[in-house]
């Protein structure tokens, strides 16, 4: 007794639509508008018939797999899990399936996962780790599909995310000038993150402010190791980059300098246009997903930076932000101690 294999034609007959419409729906054709009621009928027909699309045939016909690969070091932490969930939600809304690869920070496993992603014919790859150890397989991936680095690595030939500091620094310069600040200490990482952008803002010089950069945050030069230098410089304000805890340094300096934290946007609750509040990190990932989708729509285009806007958290905002963060389930999973330094 032969078993009838369910086809797209069977789905079309059950849903009362044409076979071509079922095909366009399954392939997420962006040029075709389908009503929600029709989508529901097709989905119900697929479920009731147990239809399974032939991915290989879809790929041969359309030249695209509608799969995006995402490679992370781990997914157990709240930030990594929020990144993955938010990215998956937006990409799935756009008609893509997302396959996660977890490397556990093992270089050999990273290479194996990249090979697997290429065998799956992914339409794009989002890589959240440092590309140094896997640049060769990443280059081979990039020859077939867009490769996105979730951090800024300008020395590597891939699309990457760059924080847009210009507007935030200009606003901060006006804020500090209005409070009579004359000496600014820039707390940055060992690579001098943010120094170039800081120097490019003319408002610092126009307001007569002096600044000095303090590179810290490494085992050889911990944050606590610059307290004596800061006391000698006597800053009126601290601007901390790359997650450096300027709040604890401020306390060690007697609490007098203003503390401006530049690492706030990905973690601050943000208001959407409809008035709803979304966790800032989730909104940040949604911005990245929109940029990924734009580049995926033009896969042959030149490699470019995807700008992620940044704003600074000034002292007057901290109480309100603390309350919003403490009421946010995402930050409750981080634990109180992990977020206290963000909003002191």
What is the role of each PLM region?
Residues 2-3, 63-66, 70-178, 192, ...:
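Alpha-helical recognition/docking segments in bacterial nutrient-uptake
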Residues 228-344:
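Flexible loop/turn connectors
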Residues 172-209, 299-321:
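An alpha-beta-alpha
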Residues 1-64:
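N-terminal helix-turn-helix DNA-binding module of bacterial transcription factors
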Residues 69-71, 185, 260:
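Short, well-ordered beta-strand segments
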Residues 12, 46, 91, 139, ...:
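A generic structural signal for well-ordered alpha-helical segments
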Residues 102, 188, 215-217:
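Residue-level recognition of beta-strand->loop/alpha-helix junctions
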């Amino acid at each position: 007794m032969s078993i009838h294999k369910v086809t797209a034609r069977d789905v079309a007959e059950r849903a009362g639509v044409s076979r071509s419409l079922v095909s366009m729906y399954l392939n997420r054709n962006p040029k075709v508008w389908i009503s929600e009621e029709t989508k529901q009928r097709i989905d119900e027909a697929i479920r009731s018939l147990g239809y399974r699309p032939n991915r290989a045939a879809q790929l041969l016909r359309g030249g695209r797999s509608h799969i995006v690969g995402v490679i992370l070091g781990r997914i157990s932490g709240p930030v990594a899990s929020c990144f993955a969930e938010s990215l998956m939600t937006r990409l799935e809304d756009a008609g893509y399936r997302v396959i996660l690869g977890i490397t556990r920070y093992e270089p050999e496993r990273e290479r194996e996962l990249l090979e697997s992603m290429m065998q799956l014919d992914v339409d794009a790859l989002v890589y959240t780790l440092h590309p140094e150890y896997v640049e060769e397989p990443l280059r081979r991936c990039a020859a077939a599909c867009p490769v996105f680095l979730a951090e800024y690595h300008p020395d590597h030939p891939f699309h990457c995310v760059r924080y847009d500091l210009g507007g935030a620094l200009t606003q901060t310069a006006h804020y500090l000038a209005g409070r009579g600040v004359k000496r600014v200490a820039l707390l940055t990482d060992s690579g001098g993150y943010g120094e170039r952008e800081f120097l490019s803002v003319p408002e610092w010089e126009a307001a007569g402010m002096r600044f000095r950069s303090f590179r810290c945050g490494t085992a050889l030069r911990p944050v606590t190791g610059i307290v004596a230098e800061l006391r000698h410089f006597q800053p009126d304000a601290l601007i901390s980059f790359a997650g450096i805890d300027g709040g604890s340094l401020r306390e060690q300096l007697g609490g007098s300098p203003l503390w401006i934290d530049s690492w706030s946007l990905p973690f601050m609750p943000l208001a959407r246009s409809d008035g709803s509040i979304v966790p800032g990190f989730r909104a940040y990932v949604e911005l990245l997903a929109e940029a990924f989708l734009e580049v995926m729509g033009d896969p042959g285009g030149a490699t470019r930076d995807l700008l992620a806007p940044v704003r600074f958290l000034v002292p007057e905002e901290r109480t309100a932000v603390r309350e919003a963060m403490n009421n946010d389930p995402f930050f409750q999973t981080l634990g109180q101690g992990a977020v206290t330094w963000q909003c002191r």
